[in-house]
Amino acid sequence: DIKLDDNNMSKYGITKELASLIQIVKPNQEYLPNNTDDIVINTLKSTDIGVAFLIKYKGKTIYHAGDLNLWVWKGEDKQFNNNMRAIFIKEIDKLNNVNIDLAFAPLDPRQEEWYGLGIDELLSRAKINYLFPMHFWQQPKIIKKFKKEREDKQLTAKIIDIEHKGQIFNIDI
């Protein structure tokens, strides 16, 4: 979440003219941006900060999880982790049987053995063609580990290997 105060506008190089074009969004809403009739943006509530986006444009669907993830941690008590799971499942269930061409979702090694729970739940619900893991803290080996641990599950989504910051991908969706 970024507040559009003078300090942050200056920090991020946002002019007053540009700020007038920014629309602040809320969870669980549908947005139809001005001057277009072929893009629809739906938001989901994050389990941390902000929202996740489901964007439909010209027959294609892109999902960006943001911080919507199954944030289960070793240092938290069972009640916290169970509550987090319930909140996450409530949101991610909105993607049941949704065809998603391109998805971006957290795969966070800080969660230790639970690092892949969020993507597992996402993949069990949505029909995803390509999935880009994110939030992996410059530890791209976690992507290969995730894929190897799930070799027997015959995932229908192609999990994209990311090897370095700034890497360029060409994907035909």
Kindly give the residue locations of the regions a language model identified.
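Active-site metal-binding motif and surrounding structural segment of the metallo-beta-lactamase
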Residues: 1-12, 93-104
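Core dinuclear metal-dependent hydrolase active-site scaffold
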Residues: 21-99, 166-173
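Active-site environment of divalent metal-dependent phosphoester hydrolases
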Residues: 2-7, 29-31, 49-51, 70-74, ...
